[in-house]
Structure formats: C-alpha cells, structure tokens
C-alpha cells in the first residue's frame, strides 16, 4: 500500500466515524444506581483524581485514540491537544504506524506534544509491531504510556487487513517487558473477556482499556470500504463496555482497567467508574465537538461534563472514584443473565 493510500484510509476512517451515530440502546441503560435522598457531602468535596500505580490523572476522562497519519488528521490532533491542555485531560493519538513507516508523517502525531508539552499523552501501536518500533513510538511523543490496540475483527473486515494473529500475545509480552512506560492493551470497540484478562495477566500486563461495543464501530467503518459492503451482519459483534467491565472484575486488583466504547453522558462515565474502571475514554464525541464546534466550545463541553460528574457523585454520596465502587447497583435481567451464564463473581457494597 502506498503512502497516499494510507493517508486516504486514515481520512476515510475519520469521515465514516464522524457520520456514525450513537446506538439507540446501550447496556449503560440496563444498570441503575439506588438513590438515597440526603447526601452527606457537598459538590466541593468531590475529588475526581484518577490514581493508578503509574499514572495520576486530574480527571478520570481521556481523549481516546482516533487519528493521525494525514494532513487533515494532523489538524484534528492539533485541536484535540489544545483541548487536552486547557482541560488537563490525558490524550491518546491514533496508531502511529504511519509515522514509524514514513518520517514525513511524524508531525501529524508530534503536533499533539508540541501543542501540549506538559500534558499526559498516550502513544499507540498495533499488537504486531516489532519491539523497537514500540520503543520508537513512545520516544516520538515523549509519551507517558503506550496503547497497544488489539483489533482482529477490524483487520478481518478491512479489505487489506492483517490475517495473521498467532504471534500477537507473545509480541505484546515482549513489548511489555521492554517498554519503560505503562503499556495499555486497548480494544477498539469489541470488548474484552475474563479469559483474555487471564492471558494478559500471565504475560505481565498491568493496564487494559476494554473498549466495548456501542461507540465507534470499526466493523461498519471497514465494511463501508469493502466493494460489496457484504459484512454488515457483524455490526453488533463483541461485548458491551458494561459486559466487559463485569468480565474484568476478578482481575481489577492486579490490572488497572480503563473503560471506553459507547460512553454518551457523564452518567455513563460514572457507571463505568462504579464498575471498577479507573478512567473513561471517548473518541467520537470529542472528534465531533472539535470539528463541528471548534476548540472553545469543546473546552466548555469538557468543563460541563466534569461538573455534571461531580453532581452525580454528590447524589451518590461518593467523594472519590473508590467510593463509587461501593455504591448499590441494580442490573437488568439481561445483564444478570450475562453475569450468571459467564459465572462472574460480582460483589458490591
């Protein structure tokens, strides 16, 4: 594939992603908090700091991986980096493969560091990159963490995608052992299982982003690029973010779990944190905000999102993220069926 074709593919991904709409129904709607009428705290008591063994985030929200690798996406990364700087959010760039192949494309990613020199930035590579390239991806952005995206459904629907996956787990293990910053194993919208969590724990992984279905749909994106558009029947493949977080429960004491995929509102973010996530990521909402409404409006959107989270936490009498994990939740019969059929041990306060 030529560099021009790769740039075109990056732009197609963004165009199709922006055109997608939120799912009509979400598993976040199938879980409810139990309301208690009189909180014992005030809004000003809320501490939204997200703390993991290696990373401290001012807020449990991050701009998740989406783009880079073309002139248009350079402009997007530049604007998102300004938003991240002004709101103190962490930010992940999209796959840096284009820059690792062609130095001319490096600036479409490094613009994020240029615009946000003191901020927290995650670099991003695929599960098949050589260790040396993973190290290069971290150095490229002076990144505080490295996302490794695992995206087999996307690859298999992508006309020119990868068809070989047998080396992925071993390669991830090699990268984890060599890279000096936290390595986050990141799905791309298909969710994670407890079996995968076991495998990742065995090779030393300490961070995952479950990225469940319901948000940006890469099966649909790649199917739109197919000549016959003949794989749309896979559109609903995978686990939701709620199901994925429940799948991780037994591993949350050893692995820091991030949640993304289909988060629409501050309440969805709070529900993710209550299920054990340390932070929550969004891609398309930020992309659409910054492209359609500009930087200032997007900054205001983030500030409002944070204030709404504080209000919800006050209603829940939760001073911090850890408190949220003790709050009572009622699940729908459908989610309870998933918990039972998957033999998941869910214990709550």
UniProtKB/Swiss-Prot annotation:
Mg(2+) binds at residue 155. One of its GO terms (molecular function) is FMN binding. FMN binds at residues 65-67, 95, 124, 186, 211, 216, 262-264, 283-284. Keywords: Cytoplasm, Flavoprotein, FMN, Isomerase, Isoprene biosynthesis, Magnesium, Metal-binding, NADP. One of its GO terms (cellular component) is cytoplasm. It catalyses: isopentenyl diphosphate = dimethylallyl diphosphate. Belongs to the IPP isomerase type 2 family. Involved in the biosynthesis of isoprenoids. Catalyzes the 1,3-allylic rearrangement of the homoallylic substrate isopentenyl (IPP) to its allylic isomer, dimethylallyl diphosphate (DMAPP). This is Isopentenyl-diphosphate delta-isomerase. It comes from Staphylococcus aureus (strain Mu3 / ATCC 700698). The lineage of its organism: Bacteria, Bacillati, Bacillota, Bacilli, Bacillales.
């Amino acid at each position: 594939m030529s560099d021009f074709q790769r740039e075109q593919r990056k732009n197609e991904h963004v165009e199709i992603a922006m055109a997608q709409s939120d799912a009509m129904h979400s598993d976040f709607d199938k879980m409810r908090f139990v309301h208690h009428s009189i909180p014992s705290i005030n809004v000003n008591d809320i501490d939204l700091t997200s703390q993991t063994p290696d990373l401290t985030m001012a807020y449990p929200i991050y701009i998740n991986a989406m783009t880079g690798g073309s002139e248009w996406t350079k402009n997007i990364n530049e604007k998102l980096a300004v938003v991240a700087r002004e709101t103190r959010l962490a930010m992940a760039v999209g796959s840096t493969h284009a820059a690792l192949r062609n130095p001319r494309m490096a600036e479409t990613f490094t613009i994020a560091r240029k615009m946000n020199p003191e901020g927290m930035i995650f670099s991003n590579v695929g599960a098949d990159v050589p260790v040396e390239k993973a190290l290069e991806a971290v150095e490229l952005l002076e990144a505080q963490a490295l996302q490794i995206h695992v995206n087999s459904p996307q690859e298999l629907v992508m006309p020119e995608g990868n068809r070989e996956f047998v080396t992925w787990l071993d390669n991830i293990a090699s990268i984890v052992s060599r890279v000096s910053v936290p390595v986050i194993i990141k799905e791309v919208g298909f969710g994670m299982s407890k079996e995968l969590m076991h495998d990742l724990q065995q090779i030393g992984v300490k961070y995952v982003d479950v990225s469940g279905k319901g948000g940006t749909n890469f099966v649909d994106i790649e199917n739109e690029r197919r000549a016959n558009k003949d794989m749309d029947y896979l559109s609903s493949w995978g686990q939701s973010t709620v199901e994925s977080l429940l799948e991780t429960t037994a591993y949350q004491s050893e692995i820091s779990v991030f949640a993304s995929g289909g988060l629409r509102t501050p309440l969805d973010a709070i529900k993710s944190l209550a299920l054990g996530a340390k932070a929550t990521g969004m891609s398309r909402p930020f992309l659409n905000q910054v492209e359609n409404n500009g930087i200032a409006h997007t900054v205001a959107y983030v500030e409002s999102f944070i204030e709404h989270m504080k209000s919800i936490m006050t209603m829940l009498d939760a001073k911090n993220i850890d408190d949220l994990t003790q709050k009572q939740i009622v699940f729908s019969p459908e989610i309870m069926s998933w918990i039972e059929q998957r033999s998941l041990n869910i214990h709550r306060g």
